[in-house]
Curated annotation (Swiss-Prot):
NCBIfam families cross-referenced by the UniProt entry: L12
UniProt keywords, alphabetically: Ribonucleoprotein, Ribosomal protein
Role, per record: Forms part of the ribosomal stalk which helps the ribosome interact with GTP-bound translation factors. Is thus essential for accurate translation.
Record protein name field: Large ribosomal subunit protein bL12
């Protein structure tokens, strides 16, 4: 019996972020492809207009865990929904992105929680 697309989607949907990262790396190695987004060149005269647009998607980066690593791990778990081991691995591997492609309010709240826990964080 073959696995259906729905079964694959359900399996991927139940994976943790760290497991998904490993899956993407395995696909890249097996099929010789890259999951990196391709850069698209905009129209030649759009450079001035692009600077005037407000950024709508932000990435929260954990730069440094600081002295109170336990509190930072708790904050990362709260922000991302990761398990204890995944959150600890993420904090130990800093600097790393914690949340990607989120709105400004969510990004600022996540940064505030990380800084209150004693970490150094930035928005990009």
């Amino acid at each position: 019996m073959a696995i259906t697309k729905e079964e694959i989607i359900d399996a991927v949907g139940s994976m943790s972020v760290m497991d998904l990262n490993d899956l993407v790396k395995a696909f890249e190695e097996k099929f010789g492809v890259s999951a990196a987004a391709m850069a698209v060149a905009g129209p030649a005269g759009a450079a001035g207009g692009a600077a005037a647009e407000e950024q709508t998607e932000f990435t929260v980066n954990l730069l440094e865990a600081g002295a109170n690593k336990v509190s930072v791990i708790k904050a990362v778990r709260e922000i991302t929904g990761l398990g204890l081991k995944e959150a600890k691995d993420l904090v130990d591997g800093a600097p790393k992105p914690i949340k990607e492609a989120v709105d400004k309010k969510t990004a600022e709240e996540a940064k505030k929680k990380l800084e209150e826990a004693g970490a150094k964080a930035e928005l990009k």
